[in-house]
Amino acid sequence: MMKELRFYNTLTRKKENFIPIDPTKVRLYVCGPTVYDYAHIGNARPLIVFDILFRLLRHVYGSDHVLYARNITDVDDKINARAACEYPNLPLNEAIRQLTERTYFQFQQDTIALGCLLPTSQPRATEHLEEMRALIERLLEKGHAYKAENHILFSISSIKNPPHYGAFANRSLDEMRAGARIDVAAYKREEMDFVLWKPSAEGEPGWKSPGGIPVLGRPGWHIECSAMSMAKLLAPYGGGLTCDDPIANIFDIHGGGLDLIFPHHENEIAQSCSAFGTERMANFWMHNGFLQVEGKKMSKSFGNFITIRSVLENNFLEFNGALAYEIKQNWAGLSARFSMLQTHYREPLNWTAQRLMQSSSELYRWYELLRDKKSMMENNEAIEDTLIDALSDDLNTPKAFTLLRKFYKAGDALALANGMNLLGLLRQEWIKEIDCPLFIKKTSLDSKFIEQCIAERLRLIHNKEWGAADKIRNELAAEGILLKDGKDPQSGKRITVWEIKRF
């Protein structure tokens, strides 16, 4: 019997059973990066969240029956500006090429280090300009778009049938006018109309314009995703502009961050539904929550802007020189993944250096168990039903981690390894390589003894035997073990985690 999946659907604002349009080709689209700068840790969150969704769907429906498209935006005004700034001595188009190739390559390295599977496809905007022009032509023909001063704009007032503009974001037009930063150009009929195509200035990248416009131009941001999702998830399966059946022009899941709900996803829906005559673009919309750094909004002005690359390169760990090079490069990535997955994807996430260190220490202890029991681990990929149940309930990764900790505590290396594999935390080859110490100075105590000491100390604290409890802490500290007390976020009980001191 196929596992029942339930996800929170932003479209309906409630948790619903997920039933794919066709279980032999489950289709997922996620908005990817604009390659003008290195991805930051806020970008890492949707990468990891939707990788978990991709892994779960593959587990339930089969790896050959899930199609995951994540786009690459390589046409954008921010790209033009950054390229001109970083490569002032190059022609703009060459500068853009160098910038986008460099940042695209780093993005791929980042996603691999974070433990993410490659999507089925990663369409680039520049590879789908023909589809964008065709989609804009369709909107012009149907009266949903108009030309003005060599621009083509989407007409909000042209929408007469559901979904009405603003319904997805749950905002009225007045609220959107008041809350959005809108470029009210003189050529717009209404202030909320948005650009589908714009003219390119001399020297800027430009392509043949739709609608008979005589000058070269480039697409707006929103039309890119409508066109690329059509190209990868609709047209190959009977949908697209040559199909008159609205049902064939809907796919299963569209994902992204909360910050994309308005205006980007609202505008995607307006474009796609108007072009195809559908009431929805995708049946499910899933959005991950925001990320803060040390309790503050991440911002260059706050000095807390952290790129994924900086996490990977400026390692927060001191590695033993004998440790395999790949582990040195990717341990920080898996530690970041471990840290992020402990918070439910729809909840706000507070990124802290302390939490990252704790995640790294715990992940290492898990690998130690796998190393110690590797001879007992059979070639068995069966995953505990309880773990699948947790992820099937709106990707409940905190509950999944509770189960993994139980497997670890019970010494069940096989269940732990299979669960880690599903969550993208397992590198089989590392189990062999990790025989050498991770840290430059490693304690002589084994992890089992340390856990026993922690349990005894917690008992002493419960009995208010403070002196004896402090003695255990001090003795462990002398061996290079740092104890950190806190509360379990679910039970509220006192817990203690440990890590090896940095020297």
Curated annotation (Swiss-Prot):
GO terms for cellular component: cytosol. A motif ('HIGH' region) lies at residues 33-43. It is found in: Cytoplasm. A motif ('KMSKS' region) lies at residues 297-301. This is Cysteine--tRNA ligase. It catalyses: tRNA(Cys) + L-cysteine + ATP = L-cysteinyl-tRNA(Cys) + AMP + diphosphate. Binds 1 zinc ion per subunit. Keywords: Aminoacyl-tRNA synthetase, ATP-binding, Cytoplasm, Ligase, Metal-binding, Nucleotide-binding, Protein biosynthesis, Zinc. The lineage of its organism: Bacteria, Pseudomonadati, Pseudomonadota, Alphaproteobacteria, Hyphomicrobiales. GO terms for molecular function: ATP binding; cysteine-tRNA ligase activity; zinc ion binding. InterPro entries: Cys-tRNA-ligase, Cys-tRNA/MSH_ligase, Rossmann-like_a/b/a_fold, tRNA-synt_1_cat_dom, tRNAsynth_Ia_anticodon-bd. Zn(2+) binds at C31, C225, H264, E268. The gene is cysS. It comes from Bartonella tribocorum (strain CIP 105476 / IBS 506). Belongs to the class-I aminoacyl-tRNA synthetase family. It holds the Pfam family tRNA-synt_1e. Monomer. Coiled coil: none annotated. Its EC number is 6.1.1.16. ATP binds at K300.
